[in-house]
Amino acid sequence: MTPVEIRNMNNEELLKLLEEKKRTLMNLRFQNALGELRDPSLIQKTKKDIARIKTILRERELGIRR
């Protein structure tokens, strides 16, 4: 997801998306541990999405807008 797409969501949607991404990351890590994950780069992409969401939530909390 791009930061623009994330910024267009409200806080409730972002929190829901954050929980979904965390569950996805957990599942990807399990698949990787079992050797079933075909594309390990998905773990890194998911972690970056989580960081983007958290950053935007924190910006809103502090009243910062880029």
Curated annotation (Swiss-Prot):
UniProtKB keywords: Ribonucleoprotein, Ribosomal protein
CC per GO annotation: cytosolic large ribosomal subunit
Keyword Nucleotidyltransferase applies: no
Single GO MF descriptor: structural constituent of ribosome
Database matches in Pfam families: Ribosomal_L29
Coiled-coil stretches noted in the UniProt entry, renumbered to this chain: none
An example Gene Ontology biological process: translation
Family the entry assigns: Belongs to the universal ribosomal protein uL29 family.
PANTHER family documented for this protein: 60S RIBOSOMAL PROTEIN L35/50S RIBOSOMAL PROTEIN L29 (PTHR10916), LARGE RIBOSOMAL SUBUNIT PROTEIN UL29C (PTHR10916:SF0)
HAMAP family: Ribosomal_uL29 (MF_00374)
Annotated protein name in UniProt: Large ribosomal subunit protein uL29
Organism: Fervidobacterium nodosum (strain ATCC 35602 / DSM 5306 / Rt17-B1)
Gene: rpmC
